[in-house]
A protein has these predicted regions:
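Charge-dense, helix-prone N-terminal extensions
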Residues: 1-120
């Protein structure tokens, strides 16, 4: 797992009703593929490989929102990814159980992104 100390510190300071869910999302991303790195961008955890893959913003209070910046470019059909725009997709997790239930599909999304970036 490519855990970034800056992100760990950010999470330690986070006062949010869904902090455990946000932490579970982070763990799921980092466990999905060893190529994934993380940082803080736009005041939220951002997951990267050959560019920004997704950010997990703490603004929503009823779910942990994950914005896949260029989600429309991720190869394959992924029910986890929602949205119809030209570029972005998003996923929402209401609780830790929903993160765990979506963990395998999230890993598929992450690997598809990483593989597509390696393929050029």
């Amino acid at each position: 797992m490519n855990e970034n100390l800056e992100v760990s510190a950010w999470l330690a300071e986070l006062d949010h009703p869904l902090k455990e869910v946000i932490e579970a999302v982070r763990t799921a991303f980092l466990d999905a593929d060893e190529r994934i790195a993380e940082t803080i961008k736009w005041k939220s955890p951002t997951f990267m490989y050959e560019g920004n893959l997704a950010s997990s913003g703490p603004k929503a209070k009823k779910h942990a929102a994950v914005l896949f910046h260029r989600g429309a470019e991720i190869p394959g059909d992924h029910a986890l990814l929602q949205g119809e725009g030209k570029m972005a997709r998003y996923a929402r997790f209401a609780d830790v159980a929903s993160v765990e239930a979506g963990r395998r599909e999230l890993a598929d999304v992450v690997r598809a992104w990483c593989d597509s970036k390696e393929a050029g």
